[in-house]
Amino acid sequence: MEVYLVGGAVRDKLLGIPVYDQDWVVVGATAEQMLNAGYSPVGKDFPVFLHPKTKQEYALARTERKTGQGYKGFECFFSPDVALEEDLLRRDLTINAIAMDSQGVLYDPYGGQQDLQNRILRHVSEAFVEDPLRVLRVARFAAKLAPLGFRVADETMQLMQSIVASGELSALTAERVWQEWHKSLLTPAPQQFLAVLRQCGALAVVLPEIDALFGVPQPEKWHPEIDTGIHTLLVAEQAAKLSSSAVVRFAAQVHDLGKGVTPPSEWPSHKMHCHTGLKLIKQLCERVRVPNEFRDLALMVCEQHSNIHRAAELKPQTMVKIFNKLDVWRKAERLNDILLCCQADHAGRQGLQDHPYPQAERIQLAYQAALSVEVQSIIQDGFKGPAIRDEQERRRTEAVKAALLNA
């Protein structure tokens, strides 16, 4: 029995970046031997076992054969006779097909180290096209490794385009699409996930609402980049710099979906996009099964971002109404998340990345002033029933007015 560290752990170790998960492949063993050694089986379709102490995954070396459509249409063959090279051959990218033994000796039959050096994401074999999920995985690796200068090999991009053309992406479940998208939101460059999917044609299939933004013009006065799709990528980039929260990053990526359905006769103006976008966000989140926490923030940002951009023009009464609608009295962190998205939107414009965003400070000032109004003092002043809320509203508005006058 031979045990090797494989996949992402070896790749990240060689790149000098933190290793979080370790996966192992076992050559020359049977399932019975693994059970006898105290390992617990976890794989229903594949021979995967958990180590009795570390709980890390150990998989028997295997080969795969395409038998049907989609990422599940595979027949798995495993036996003690399957060689390490055969197991590595079925993997997606050369940089993920390097193994390391207990002495630190590397086994790299497909040139993964060379591609790591050259910063290339390249498929291991032509069997790459058999699994449509790999299109999304490569896009995610492009996002994860973008700061190190990685790019997708031309020939791999061609294979990704052929997978899209084959219609195989339709076999991906909503859960798988969301899983990869969510993982991409946690990478250093989430915009690259969208950009690579756009490049190979997959964005139109898995996230058509975002794809529809490309080629849609905006007023050059406010958006030097003009194209709404390019703006979305820039906003995604800025959101990742401003916040590590996947929820904030998601909301930033989808806040402008309404611009994709503006009638061309109205271009480059998008007066209704804050409202038309709400339906599209709901539709996308339902289809891809996006968690409610992500959907809810995205809807709020979509509806309010134009108002927040105009913070200097908003009346105190309007500000309090916005705070009520967002329910920030009970969820203070929500306002901060929304302001981060708006700041990313503001900075996500060509040449304006470092432009100040005083609107956030003004909104926060107004919020803190409104927050200082205590309901207890209103009750002590003799107000009862519905009159308490009316008086609270009035005092909050006055507090905001005074704070902004003194700003």
From Swiss-Prot:
CTP binds at residues 8, 11, 91, 137, 140. Residues 228-329 form the HD domain. It comes from the Bacteria. One of its GO terms (biological process) is tRNA 3'-terminal CCA addition. One of its GO terms (molecular function) is magnesium ion binding. Keywords: ATP-binding, Hydrolase, Magnesium, Metal-binding, Multifunctional enzyme, Nickel, Nucleotide-binding, Nucleotidyltransferase, RNA repair, RNA-binding, Transferase, tRNA processing. It catalyses: a tRNA precursor + 2 CTP + ATP = a tRNA with a 3' CCA end + 3 diphosphate; a tRNA with a 3' CCA end + 2 CTP + ATP = a tRNA with a 3' CCACCA end + 3 diphosphate. Its EC number is 2.7.7.72, 3.1.3.-, 3.1.4.-. Magnesium is required for nucleotidyltransferase activity. ATP binds at residues 8, 11, 91, 137, 140. Mg(2+) binds at residues 21, 23. Monomer. Can also form homodimers and oligomers. HAMAP family: CCA_bact_type1, CCA_bact_type2. PANTHER family: MULTIFUNCTIONAL CCA PROTEIN (PTHR47545:SF1). Comprises two domains: an N-terminal domain containing the nucleotidyltransferase activity and a C-terminal HD domain associated with both phosphodiesterase and phosphatase activities. Catalyzes the addition and repair of the essential 3'-terminal CCA sequence in tRNAs without using a nucleic acid template. Adds these three nucleotides in the order of C, C, and A to the tRNA nucleotide-73, using CTP and ATP as substrates and producing inorganic pyrophosphate. tRNA 3'-terminal CCA addition is required both for tRNA processing and repair. Also involved in tRNA surveillance by mediating tandem CCA addition to generate a CCACCA at the 3' terminus of unstable tRNAs. While stable tRNAs receive only 3'-terminal CCA, unstable tRNAs are marked with CCACCA and rapidly degraded. A single active site specifically recognizes both ATP and CTP and is responsible for their addition. Belongs to the tRNA nucleotidyltransferase/poly(A) polymerase family. Bacterial CCA-adding enzyme type 1 subfamily. This is Multifunctional CCA protein.
